[in-house]
Regions:
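Non-transmembrane, aqueous-exposed alpha-helical and coiled segments at domain scale
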Residues: 1, 129-130, 138-140
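Membrane-proximal intracellular helices of multi-pass ion channels
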Residues: 2, 72, 154-160, 167-177
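Short glycine-rich, Thr/Ser-proximal phosphate-binding strand/loop in the N-terminal lobe
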Residues: 3, 12-58
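Short glycine-aspartate micro-motif
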Residues: 3-5, 87-89, 144
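Conserved active-site "lid/cap" helical segment
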Residues: 37-86, 116, 130
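Short beta-strand-loop/turn "lid" adjacent to the catalytic site in phosphate-handling enzymes
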Residues: 77-123, 151-159
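Conserved small/polar residues in nucleotide/adenosyl-binding loops
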Residues: 180
Length: 180
């Protein structure tokens, strides 16, 4: 079983491809400067050699597509076919209070996650672009969301409440989340 993990940031995408039978990372890398001049993919080949591939990457969808194509590239890839990928995991930044554990991404989950965009305006939209790009290229692959905010959902209220009017917490969900 092979699992691809993506971390889509505001101007970057990091990835690792895990072979769960051997419990090894078989491919890893990252795209930097998405939407800027001089964007590139830095990757580590299965033999440990590091490479930099320069490419104009104007947005995340093209970045995810470039990563997937690189994974199956005869010169740089770690797998022969995208069919070898059994699931994709996504680091998702702010899931509000709704997501206290990892979840299978579906329409309802993505709508609820989108509703949290104001809480992480640089990261949540980028996370969604990664999910949508994978859905377009690998429509039958299960995708899992792992939320930064889930790690601290068990804190007592006195530990996560800010000294602000309680109505702001109720209306906007503003609370200590310890992300970043």
């Amino acid at each position: 079983m092979k699992i691809l993990v993506l971390n889509c940031g505001s101007s970057s995408i990091k990835y690792k491809l895990f072979d769960m039978t051997t419990k090894e990372v078989i491919a890893q890398g990252g795209i930097e400067k998405i939407g800027l001049k001089g964007s590139f993919l830095k990757l580590t080949l299965p033999n440990g050699e590091k490479k930099v591939l320069e490419k104009d990457i104007p947005e995340h969808t093209i970045g995810v597509e470039f990563i997937l194509n690189t994974l199956i590239n005869p010169e740089y890839g770690a797998i022969k076919s995208l069919d070898e990928i059994n699931a994709v995991g996504h680091r998702m930044v702010h899931g509000g209070e709704r997501f206290s554990e990892s979840v299978l991404l579906n329409k309802e989950v993505l709508e609820a996650f989108t509703a949290c965009n104001d809480l992480a305006p640089l990261h949540n939209p980028a996370n969604l672009k990664g999910v949508n790009a994978v859905s377009a290229i690998l429509p039958n692959i299960p995708q899992i969301g792992v939320f930064d905010t889930a790690f601290h959902q068990t804190m007592p209220d006195y530990a996560y409440m800010y000294a602000i009017p309680y109505e702001m917490y109720e209306k906007y969900g503003v609370r200590l989340s310890l992300i970043h």
